Regions:
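Acidic, Ser/Thr- and proline-rich intrinsically disordered linker/docking segments
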Residues: 137-192
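Terminal and domain-flanking low-complexity segments
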Residues: 4, 35-58, 128, 176-192
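Short beta-strand element of the conserved SAM-dependent methyltransferase core
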Residues: 79-83, 124, 165-167, 174
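Conserved beta-hairpin
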Residues: 111-137
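N-terminal signal-anchor transmembrane alpha helix of single-pass membrane proteins
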Residues: 1-38
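Residue-level marker of intrinsically disordered, low-complexity segments enriched
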Residues: 6, 10-12, 60, 66, ...
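Anionic N-terminal interaction surfaces
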Residues: 29-121
Length: 192
């Protein structure tokens, strides 16, 4: 055999070995994340069902323990576990079209974020999102919210239901029953 044929055979064998290694690693990754994928699919099915059931419903006004200005209406009030992370949010065009914005981060090979969840009271009005963590208030305008996505949060190998709200230079990771909160924010942003 000529040296060209031997070289081609060697390259084909090396290519097939790399291909086999890639398939094995992909299979092991799929096995490792099987629970997450199943949990995430169930959670997104519940979210889609909730969206369809409440698509045409109006946001109902609720009373807060604090007095609101005349032009503000209380829409959501709940104590949730919230972790605040300072990270610059890049500007995309269609944040709200993508309910799966955080999925890539959750399926990462490495734990990239360490969450520090604290019980925090969250208030949503037609103009502001307010966080009360007993030490101080954080007040964000609804227009400052860049995205609000339902997601499964993977924290120290525990799978939790929640959402991620991205604001200018901050990311809020929220655990708990947040379907009404996310739906209200999307309706206020006129994205739903």
């Amino acid at each position: 055999m000529s040296s060209k044929v031997i070289t081609i055979i060697i390259f084909i064998v090396i290519y097939l070995v790399f291909l086999l290694i890639t398939f094995i690693l992909a299979y092991l990754y799929q096995i490792k994340n099987r629970d997450f994928i199943h949990f995430n699919n169930k959670y997104l099915e519940d979210w889609n069902k909730y969206k369809l059931e409440n698509k045409d419903s109006n946001l109902s006004e609720i009373e807060f323990e604090y007095e609101l200005p005349e032009n503000e209406i209380g829409l959501f009030q709940k104590e949730l576990l919230i972790s605040k992370t300072n990270e610059k949010t890049p500007d995309y065009k269609d944040y709200f079209d993508d309910d799966y914005l955080v999925l890539k981060k959750s399926l990462s090979l490495y734990q990239t974020t360490s969450y520090h969840f604290e019980p925090t009271k969250l208030y949503l009005t037609n103009l502001h999102l307010v966080l009360d963590d007993n030490d101080q208030f954080y007040k964000y305008k609804i227009d400052e919210i860049k995205s609000c996505s339902i997601c499964v949060i993977k924290d120290k190998n525990l799978l939790e239901k929640g959402c991620v709200i991205k604001i200018k230079d901050q990311s809020l990771t929220i655990l708990g029953d947040v379907f009404l909160l996310v739906l209200a924010i999307k309706k206020l942003k006129k994205e739903f």
